[in-house]
Amino acid sequence: MAAKQEFASRFAKHKDELEWLFMELYHNREGLEVLEREMAEAYNARSAELKALDKARSADPDWYKRGNMFGMTMYTDLFAGNLKELAKKLPYLKEQKLTYLHLMPLLRMPHPHNDGGYAVEDFDTVDPTLGTNKDLENLTRELRKAGISLCLDFVMNHTASTHRWAMAAKAGDATYQAYYHCYDDRTIPDQYEQTVPQVFPNTAPGNFTWCEEMHKWVLTTFHDYQWDLNYANPAVFVDMTKSILHLANLGVEVFRIDAVPYIWKQLGTTCRNLPQVHTIVRMLRMVLEVVCPAVVLKGEVVMAPKELAAYFGTPEKPECHMLYNVSTMVNLWGALASRDTRLLKAQLDALHALPDNCWFVNYLRCHDDIGWGLDEAIEEKLGIDPQKHKEYLYHFYEGNFPGSWAKGELYNYDPATGDARSCGTTASLCGVEQALEKGDNIALDYAVKRDLLLHTAMAFLQGFPMLNCGDEIAQLNGWDYKNDPDRVEDSRNLHRSKFNWENAKQRTRKGTLQNALWQGMEELRKMRADECFSPDAWVTTWDSHNPGVLALVRKRGEETLVGLFNFTEYPAGASLDALGGKYTTADGKTVWLADVELQPYQALLVKKA
């Protein structure tokens, strides 16, 4: 009886708004009734352990905003082979005091071409190469015991062309053809092409693919084997919601909703950031708050800062709990290569101007490339040529520019537009790989300093940090992908290599490269234990009076923590005279911010005395 009352109480809170939004979007009472039945069934199927977690999280809604949050992302197979073996590696994760683990897509996918798992064949089943649903459930249970929340991708925009819905559509089933955007001729597709940008103009040109089995054109925003779902069909929303609830009941606590700005299609638009996207995300948020309030939504929104606030919704009607901080990641790498933090500061100022409910997952590298989506209007105001700057950056991180320390590769280079993205691990892009090849210990020291500088700046930002697995031991590029015919065409595989367990053994040996990074990550965790990393802390940039130095300030009550980050290879002065008073370092040294001297690539953290 108590369980029924709990569900009824949560549902009553959202019933009117959920039903209003669903009917406004779909005008389909039958679909709404199916959705509400699925919600009740998912709640009833939820384990007592997970329901207890729901209660705990409801009592502490800011749990993911606390300073102890520290994340990592990885591919299951590259780290451990499969889910069972990954569970055996938990001591390594616990050693790092992780609280958040994002496993790259692990649901059933076609092989070998699956866009790194983002072409999903079955949203309810773990891919057999990685294990079973029981293995996933066992892993989430062990992670919870260790205080680690599991994040999985939920690919909302599309399915694999081999998904059972797509296979039924190919066989002529009109019901499932309506799950996608299918057209008999090019009339409507050509109208879409006039306004919809191409994601991969070179490797996957156009937004439509001819399906010979159906004799129809199907919308494929990304690759030809990824069919865009038709969210104008209420059955699609209901079925996808059913799947996310199923995964939540296996113990998944965070969902990274992939490519969410793309999910609604409308002729005459770019099919990006449309109002109906927010209706769908808001409905999904309410469903989760009713059935499994412990679960958090993390949006993947690769858009300008001005577009981001909408994806958080409002405090009264929230959508995503947090977003990937793509823009700052790009600007951190840009500042390092340019030795100029002005663009980074401007971008951070735009983020800091967002409402208080906006929260970010900060990172340097992940499974994807670095796309140089810098703010061209700000670049021009600063006297920077946007195109030349972009070309400089991707050539620099390719290692194909005089004086570059980096080793990487280009991704999706387009000679017609001069556009390209960058691939490589953090360590290799910071110069570790090149220094080791040359046997240059001075260059290696600088490379490690760059690596730690970026990580420290990233961990200081509003939100919480997420490491890319291997960064904690300075893992290098995996050039052997070029010998694999199934992987050679995608240069992102350069930074998708097997975890080097032999190198990991060196992490506790003083004087090793691995220990330098390992200890550096430990210092970040100590830094974030400060009360200035509480959810209600105020974060802002400050004028350092030196374009090569980024200044960040965290303040909570009477406590103030200042971070100064020298993005150059030279000693650099900074002056923050408006921040008066005496400051001290962690080891007790006194610093006066009116006149500070920083060493090359130094990250200086000082607390107001």
Please tell me what each predicted stretch does:
Residues 1-579, 587-588, 592-609:
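Active-site and adjacent substrate-binding regions of carbohydrate-active enzymes
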